[in-house]
Amino acid sequence: MGLVKVIKNKAYFKRYQVKLKRRREGKTDYYARKRLTVQDKNKYNTPKYRLIVRLTNKDIVAQLAYSKIEGDVVVASAYAHELPRYGLKAGLTNYAAAYATGLLLARRHLKAIGLDSTYKGHEELTGEDYNVEEEGDRAPFKAVLDIGLARTTTGSKIFAVMKGVADGGINVPHSESRFFGFDQESKDYNAEAHRDRILGKHVADYMSLLKEEDEDRYKRQFSKFLSNGMNADNLVATYQKAHANIRADPSPSAKKAAKPSKRHTAKRLTYDERKQRVADKKALLLQLKEQQQE
């Protein structure tokens, strides 16, 4: 069959159907979303939960959500900007912070649904691959990873968040092939290297190296770390302490009372107020007129 030229006449435009808004904006992959959200037909009123991970320039977002016709419902969320509460006051977008954010999300949600004591997760960090096993009467909470439009690169921070969630006690179907430390050629997984990455040892090593080579650049580049008492010697211990603090109290901080917004426009008066305002103006004008006549 030869080339068929599309004739863009009135009938073409009349029948033309635009794609969905978020597809036109390049924000949602609906091919993937359909497979992440559609539940089996023999399961009724059982939502399929998604572990949503998004990376920004200044933050790491981790959420547990399920979809409804009206839109997605977020049941739990954790952010890297919450980590200063647990002792991590700098480096909130690195690999170690991504793991801590995932751990915070898992422990927070399990505490909310009353499974934190049953499924404690992998309490001793070894870097080994960990999958939750069913214990007691209630099955572990299950969620599938949703990475949006990000690339599934081996060693990505997205999988650090997933590792934190899995170690926190939530069942996330995965394999070790995308973790840091996995060799694509030999198919071997170096758990020790992954553990060092999670505890920020690579950052500590670079801090030591940079301090020896160029101290001025070291002070400039790691100024936030140094001002908060984080250096190459105590960095690994700081991350370990943060993990312990997260497990001790994963609950979100209390919201501050919202301040009343400043009003930049005049408040609308009621009918009685407008009537009284006119009467006051009339009285003032009459008073001024009497003063002039005197």
Swiss-Prot record:
Biased composition (Basic residues): 256-267
Transmembrane segments: none
Record's keyword terms, sorted: Cytoplasm, Nucleus, Ribonucleoprotein, Ribosomal protein, RNA-binding, rRNA-binding
GO molecular function, one term: structural constituent of ribosome
InterPro entries, alphabetized: Rbsml_uL18_euk, Ribosomal_uL18_C_euk
GO biological process: ribosomal large subunit assembly; translation
Places the protein is found: Cytoplasm; Nucleus
Disulfide-bonded cysteines: none
A cellular-component GO term for this protein: cytosolic large ribosomal subunit
PANTHER family (UniProt xref): LARGE RIBOSOMAL SUBUNIT PROTEIN UL18, RIBOSOMAL PROTEIN L5-RELATED
Family classification: Belongs to the universal ribosomal protein uL18 family.
HAMAP family the UniProt entry points to: Ribosomal_uL18_A
Function as written in the Swiss-Prot or TrEMBL entry: Component of the ribosome, a large ribonucleoprotein complex responsible for the synthesis of proteins in the cell. The small ribosomal subunit (SSU) binds messenger RNAs (mRNAs) and translates the encoded message by selecting cognate aminoacyl-transfer RNA (tRNA) molecules. The large subunit (LSU) contains the ribosomal catalytic site termed the peptidyl transferase center (PTC), which catalyzes the formation of peptide bonds, thereby polymerizing the amino acids delivered by tRNAs into a polypeptide chain.
The name this protein goes by in its record: Large ribosomal subunit protein uL18
The species this protein was found in: Caenorhabditis briggsae
